[in-house]
Amino acid sequence: MTMTDPLGDMITRIRNAQLRGKGKVVTPASKLRGWVLDVLAEEGFIRGYARVEYPGGKSDFEIELKYNEGAPVIQMIERVSTPGRRVYSSVKTMPTVHNGLGISILSTPKGIMSDVAAREQNVGGEVLCRVF
């Protein structure tokens, strides 16, 4: 069965695992998911992730979720741009998430990055998701 929104699936898996208090969550691996996980780890929303290889060429990401005194660090994670409704933002119109306490993850011509990094590099792009 093919998946129409692999990134949306990963975001939902992370959200559901955090709501259940899980320490780890597994999601199928892809380049886009890896780049988004790099940003989440860099910004301190997850502890990290590892790629797990299986025979036959299949691989998964095992994501270590982060908690602060028992409460999930990720309070809100949502998909913004979907396959049926793409959302783009220039540097001037880029929204802040909870007055700068959260981040937006963007796909730009210079790669996947947070809204803070995109403003520093003066590039806009597709708003993939918001995290707080």
UniProtKB/Swiss-Prot annotation:
A GO cellular-component term linked to this record: ribosome
Keywords: Ribonucleoprotein, Ribosomal protein, RNA-binding, rRNA-binding
Taxonomy, superkingdom: Bacteria
SUPFAM superfamilies reported in the protein's UniProt record: Ribosomal protein S8 (SSF56047)
InterPro entries linked to this entry: Ribosomal_uS8 (IPR000630), Ribosomal_uS8_CS (IPR047863), Ribosomal_uS8_sf (IPR035987)
Key word Repressor present: no
A single BP term in Gene Ontology: translation
UniProt entry tagged with the keyword Ribonucleoprotein: yes
Single GO MF annotation: rRNA binding
Family: Belongs to the universal ribosomal protein uS8 family.
Physiological role: One of the primary rRNA binding proteins, it binds directly to 16S rRNA central domain where it helps coordinate assembly of the platform of the 30S subunit.
Assembly description: Part of the 30S ribosomal subunit. Contacts proteins S5 and S12.
Record's protein name: Small ribosomal subunit protein uS8
Organism of origin: Parvibaculum lavamentivorans (strain DS-1 / DSM 13023 / NCIMB 13966)
